[in-house]
């Protein structure tokens, strides 16, 4: 197996901030609202580069050695099918929805199922996810017209270590004060149903997609709750599996076994670690190839935590 660090791709967003620098030492552009860092992505407009080799994720995916890098369970798709981001939401995001696979083509978009893992939250941080029990489509449309649609959403307070699974069709928004690791299908399709009547960087209201949103919203999706992890497993779905590995004692050791079935994306969410003899700080993202072997992991802090992503 081989371990590669990943070169992040920063995205300016009106709701972003500077927390990726403050928390993780990232070299983000100063005095700019950086809302997203694309950690692992294979899209025409953005392709992750592996620092040590200089190769892009797409070059590995398109190579004859795909199974060597991504494992025997890698699907036969034109692009690497998972997109992983860090989000710094210092203002609330739009109320939005992503299209289900059955509706995406007619909406001229790509389907997106995703999950959020909360890394840091302010005392007042919250999210909007799904509908309040009993909200109907006519009620939702009436609230849209009266600019009160946020009242239709189910609201949850957030805390570090919580996770929310968001299947396509679930209306949602991230509230202010959340720093999140997001794992999703490789899609950049978002339909905004409401954007709090604010303007974008150009002083104009950002585009809304009300008709597409209404077509895609699951109006039977009421009051979803945070994910309930089973042992190390946080979430698994048909697109990805996300695990959490906790180290509750200083200098605690552990092993991560690579079977050959799949790659690992590894994110250091708490503490610092020595992995196979090399030290890595909090906020580091690593790509670990699928060649069989065992990684020796040692926590270098009182408490440590790793998040890993691989195939389901």
Model-derived segments and spans:
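His/acidic/aromatic-lined binding-pocket segments of jelly-roll/cupin-type domains
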Residues: 84-85, 93, 114-117, 155-156, ...
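Double-stranded beta-helix
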Residues: 128-151, 180-222, 302, 307-312
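Short, structured patches in soluble enzyme cores that scaffold and shape functional sites
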Residues: 97-99, 119-122, 131-133, 144, ...
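Short acidic-glycine-tyrosine-enriched beta hairpin
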Residues: 153-165, 275-294
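Transition-metal
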Residues: 1-135, 195-220, 242
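Ligand-binding loop in jelly-roll beta-barrel domains
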Residues: 79, 87-92, 100-101, 108-111, ...
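C-terminal amphipathic alpha-helical segment
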Residues: 190-260
């Amino acid at each position: 197996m081989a371990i590669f660090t990943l070169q992040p791709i920063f995205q300016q967003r009106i709701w972003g901030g500077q927390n990726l620098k403050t928390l993780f030492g990232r070299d983000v552009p100063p005095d700019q609202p950086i809302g997203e860092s694309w950690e692992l992505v294979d899209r025409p407009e953005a392709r992750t580069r592996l620092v040590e080799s200089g190769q892009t994720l797409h070059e590995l995916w398109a190579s004859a050695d795909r199974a060597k890098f991504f494992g025997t369970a890698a699907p036969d798709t034109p692009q690497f099918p998972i997109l992983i981001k860090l989000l710094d939401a210092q203002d609330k995001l739009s109320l939005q929805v992503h299209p289900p696979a059955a509706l995406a083509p007619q909406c001229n978009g790509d389907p997106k199922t995703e999950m959020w893992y909360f890394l840091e939250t302010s005392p007042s941080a919250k999210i909007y996810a799904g509908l309040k029990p009993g909200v109907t489509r006519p009620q939702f449309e009436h609230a849209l017209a009266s600019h009160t649609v946020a009242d239709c959403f189910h609201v949850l307070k957030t805390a570090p270590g919580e996770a929310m699974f968001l299947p396509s069709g679930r209306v949602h928004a991230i509230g202010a004060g959340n720093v999140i690791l997001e794992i999703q299908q490789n899609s950049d399709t978002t339909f905004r149903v409401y954007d709090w009547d604010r303007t974008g960087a150009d002083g104009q209201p950002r585009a809304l997609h009300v008709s597409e949103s209404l077509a895609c919203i699951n109006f039977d999706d009421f009051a979803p709750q945070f994910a309930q992890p089973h042992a190390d497993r946080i979430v698994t779905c048909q697109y990805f599996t996300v695990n959490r590995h906790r180290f509750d004692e200083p200098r605690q050791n552990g092993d991560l076994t690579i079977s050959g079935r799949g790659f690992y994306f590894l994110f250091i969410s708490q503490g610092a670690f020595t992995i196979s003899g090399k030290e890595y700080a909090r906020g580091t993202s690593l790509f670990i190839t699928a060649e069989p072997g065992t990684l020796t992991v040692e926590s270098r802090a009182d408490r440590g935590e790793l998040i890993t992503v691989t195939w389901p």
